Amino acid sequence: MLIPKENRKAIHQALFSQGVLVAKKDFNLPKHPEVGVPNLQVIKACQSLDSRGYLKTRYNWGWFYYTLTNEGVEYLREYLHLPAEVVPATHKRQVRPTAPRAGRPEPRERASADAGYRRAEKKDEGAAPSGFAPSFRGGFGRPQ
């Protein structure tokens, strides 16, 4: 499908900035909500990138989910003339705040009454006698 260069560039920029793109399976939708180009052009451009191995496509409940592969990141970086330091949002490490370790209270010891029931010694009261030999005799009134 022939897609104007500015539309193709807008699709590639949106895909590279986030690393993922979602498109509704509606070929008659006048504009894609995120990119601003016709939805058919978004789907076909992503289909083209998928056939070359630059995207992974998932389809679920009427929506296409496109995810960039590592080869796709390299291809779009070259296509959009971006430096190697620029990466999609999905490839960036998220910095999580660490909780302070010093503020935690020490674990308390269990009460002695609690320890007696938790660590009771095991007894062999429930074992069968040494001469016990079970045998199968049929069952439920069936002949042997």
UniProtKB/Swiss-Prot annotation:
Predominant location category: cytoplasm
Ranges annotated as biased composition (Basic and acidic residues): 103-126
Compartments where located: Cytoplasm
Region: Disordered, residue numbers: 90-144
GO process annotations (BP): cytoplasmic translation
Annotated family: Belongs to the eukaryotic ribosomal protein eS10 family.
Assembly with partners or alone: Component of the small ribosomal subunit (SSU). Mature yeast ribosomes consist of a small (40S) and a large (60S) subunit. The 40S small subunit contains 1 molecule of ribosomal RNA (18S rRNA) and at least 33 different proteins. The large 60S subunit contains 3 rRNA molecules (25S, 5.8S and 5S rRNA) and at least 46 different proteins. eS10 interacts with GCN1 (via middle region); this interaction is direct and promotes GCN2 kinase activity.
Name recorded for this polypeptide: Small ribosomal subunit protein eS10A
Taxonomic source organism: Schizosaccharomyces pombe (strain 972 / ATCC 24843) (Fission yeast)
Lineage, broadest ranks: Eukaryota, Fungi, Dikarya, Ascomycota, Taphrinomycotina
Annotated gene: rps1001
